[in-house]
Amino acid sequence: MASLVAIAIAMALMVVQPGRQMTAFAARTSPAAAAEAFWRAAMPGAPMPDAIVELLHHEHGVASAGGKANGGGDGPPPPMNFNYDDYRALPRSDAPSPDALNRVAAVQNADENGVSSPPPPPPTVFFLEDAVRVGESLPLPRPAADATAAGAAAATALPPLRLYTVRSVRAIEGSSFVVCRGETTAGAGVYGCRDAATGPARAYAVDAAGGGGGDAVIAAVVCHADTSRWDPDHAAFRLLGVRPGGAAVCRAVADAHILPTNKD
């Protein structure tokens, strides 16, 4: 009788513990495997989106793809390939997760005189207003310090965008705004402001932190409330799955401040 009880207890432990055993094993292998095991244990039956899987394995994938590209003479692989279809299929919200619209290389090229050319403008990031919430993730341009620390050779392999977790959101009163941002050009600091939207808009001041509790960033978020006059072929409509005049389309500017204006 005692042996039967012992066998029953052992079988129960084998049934209950597989998720924990899987997580413990994955933690001893690699951070990416640990993250995937945690996802399976916490959300059984829900597949991890391809964008998250690619982000976890991005560093390894760039190294292998880069070697192949150098041998074949092709350009570097694309930094990140977010799948909007996966985000639209998520059951947690009717709105897709935020994603990047433009991909640019964060590398400065020198002209014939050896003087560095001005840095390219940061990539524009479009997303829906549902993403401006505490706990959501926003892709923002990678800080220039990241590219400098990585070196000029490795900077081409770095994705121009980096995911930040929203920690706080503060709505700015008003319907028209200007965004002000400081830039360094030719060793001199320049602080400029420009209109944030041509039509009615909503604005937010967002405090976000990089992955793993990294550097914090203050971002100005402007949501265009009326997109009825936008070009119907605008890439934001295609990627976000919305139509002109529908849901508000938002964009973020890192390290910027936003101020309301009174237009008579």
UniProtKB/Swiss-Prot annotation:
Residues 37-263 form the BURP domain. InterPro entries: BURP, BURP_dom. It comes from the Eukaryota. Specifically expressed in the tapetum, connective and endothecium tissues of anthers. Pfam families: BURP. Residues 1-18 form the signal peptide. Keywords: Signal. Transmembrane segments: none annotated. The keyword Acetylation does not apply. This is BURP domain-containing protein 15.
